[in-house]
Regions:
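NTP-binding/hydrolysis catalytic cores, primarily Walker-type P-loop NTPases
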Residues: 49-52, 220-257
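C-terminal lobe helix-coil module of Hanks-type protein kinase domains
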Residues: 1-44
């Protein structure tokens, strides 16, 4: 049988380079050392990207209908618009993204990703599906409603989308405890205004939290939401100041579409 690694893009590219050097016909070989060097440099850049680790941020919901997917999509688009390409990834068995794409008349590209505006969205495929490697500086994993019996992916930090009203606090506390046992967790209160009075129990007193203002479309820029996402990102990564990176023309054009 053919070794699995031979199906990887970098192996196929290396194989083409070798065959291009050994072709019997002169016209089929590389025409100059510069052409060969350029192709080898492209392969080297691809391998460097794969060696770089993506920063993983997991979004989880304390309850159904709290807005986890909306919040996660908003975060991925905020980062991408500001020069840090982020992949939104459905990390639990759901058809939400496919339903959204169907309603918008959008199909996946060859890597299994939907492109909406400047954003990249990968639906849930399950562990059995082998997809092409994609490098993104940040991957936003949406795990849906958090459940004690389910295994959570590793992450640089976790974001718990939750409610702070009196009937929601118990679920928020229980979900926060689960995430706190896994690593750094931040509470993101949805459907609540900043001025709302919030009294957290002592068990959550050391956990940082933010309020996500209402915004109807996660694919559109919203100034108030941007401020929340910026502060959330800085807190989760330990950065003290957000620096907006220069966007490429490609991203600018995509966001305008």
């Amino acid at each position: 049988s053919v070794p699995e690694y031979r199906n990887e893009p970098e192996y196929r590219m290396f194989d083409r380079i070798i065959r291009g050097c050994m072709e019997k016909e002169k016209e089929a070989r590389y025409q100059s050392a510069d052409e060969l060097q350029e192709t080898l440099q492209e392969l080297q850049n691809q391998l460097k990207e794969q060696a770089a680790e993506s920063r993983i941020v997991v979004f989880a919901g304390a309850a159904a209908g709290i807005g986890t997917t909306h919040a996660a999509l908003g975060m991925s688009h905020f980062l991408t618009r500001n020069g840090c390409p982020a992949l939104y990834q459905e990390a639990y068995d759901t058809s939400a993204v496919r339903t959204l794409a169907k309603n918008m008349g959008i199909k996946t590209d060859r890597t299994g990703v939907y492109r909406i505006g400047c954003g990249s969205i990968r639906p849930y495929y399950g562990e059995a599906v082998k997809l092409p490697y994609l490098y993104f500086p940040v991957i936003i994993k949406d795990v849906g409603v958090i459940r004690p019996e389910e295994k959570l992916p590793e992450a640089d930090f976790y974001v718990l989308v939750c409610g702070g009203k009196w009937w929601e606090i118990d679920r928020t506390v229980n979900a926060a405890k689960i995430l706190k046992s896994r690593g750094n967790v931040i509470l993101l209160f949805n459907h609540m205004e900043k001025k709302a009075r919030l009294k957290l129990p002592k068990v959550l007193s050391d956990i940082h939290y933010f309020f996500l203002p209402f915004f109807s479309n996660p694919f559109r820029e919203d100034k108030a939401a941007n401020t929340c996402y910026r502060d959330l990102w800085n807190d989760g990564t330990g950065e003290t100041r957000w620096k907006r990176k220069k966007l490429s023309q490609r991203l600018r054009r995509s966001d305008a579409e």
